[in-house]
């Protein structure tokens, strides 16, 4: 049994009840086989794979808070600090009923390599809670956030661990969290990113993940002699990532015809109206039924099991921007049958492993979220830089740096894949390229720092 197989067996034995984490580890280690086999003695002697798949620490805590009826509620909070070999732990806080240790570990593990790819000095971590902000009043959200930070503050800091937003954690929640940290510590420091512009936030942070996804997608297509202008796109989701991916796609001359939320999806052959979508989702916080009611060209479809949703339409580019494992093997078959050119992930691991392999085997240009959605964390790191220097850059400055970072990420993952002849379906294996490029930087730092 080789070193990779030995470590995979150990990880599966130790984390048997954590399917999301195991899926992420298996995907990464399988793609790293050529790198590890080329340096197996060195990596095995230094237990590199054992160390990189085991978090530095995982913190789980009780979060009690009082609802509007005076009833005490209790949620579970998490922070997994995975690896800080190249910088402070960095990763979002997810507030969603599905949150558990497995999901937070999978996200933290992925974050290590994603953050490495940004070319910026940030390590990997993730956190969150099974608290559901939907349907809660502002007072209830504040009560939860203050209780959550009353425990979390012990483990974070501007040079230690810098959390950010994620699903369920937007500007409102970040504000409440930052206020409580400042109140407890008496420090005004860049301990969170995604802050409001009046208290240390960065311009272009809101747009960063979606814009970055399109910058990388455009670089990918250009490298293959394809012009994004005139292409038709399917996007899933209707949160920040999806909205600004749609906006940037339109700016680049493409047309996005779908978006979705937890209850259903929109098909709009005239192209999604971004201004209307923003009004429905960012201002009214309403369902997509309101978009359809205000847009004659749009069709609304309620979500039903067994349907392909946004992936059933004939499109050139697919951009999954909703949540993990949303695009399965049947969806992948539908996309391939309809002649999709590329799939680039805006969400974290939205494509199942089986679907990923099918897309790649059928010659689809596929870039996973580790590289494709790194724009968000890259701009968070730029926010950290601005906070450290007590400066505020213009939108154009931040957006220009973001575009450069995403183009560099594409170049690096393409180069890494080619160095190890990583191909699948006759095309460059960008998933392997991302894992290799991210892994090499982290491992070099780990080896330089000794056993720690």
Question: Could you tell me what each predicted segment is?
Answer:
Residues 2-24, 220, 336-452:
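Adenosine-phosphate binding glycine-rich loop
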Residues 193-196, 201-314:
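Glycine-rich phosphate/diphosphate-binding loop of Rossmann-like nucleotide-binding domains
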Residues 2, 16-23, 27, 43, ...:
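Conserved active-site and cofactor/substrate-binding residues in soluble primary-metabolism enzymes
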Residues 42-71:
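Structured beta-strand/loop patches that form or line metal/cofactor-binding pockets in enzymes
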Residues 96, 115-229:
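Glycine/serine-rich phosphate-binding loop and adjoining beta1-alpha1 elements at the start
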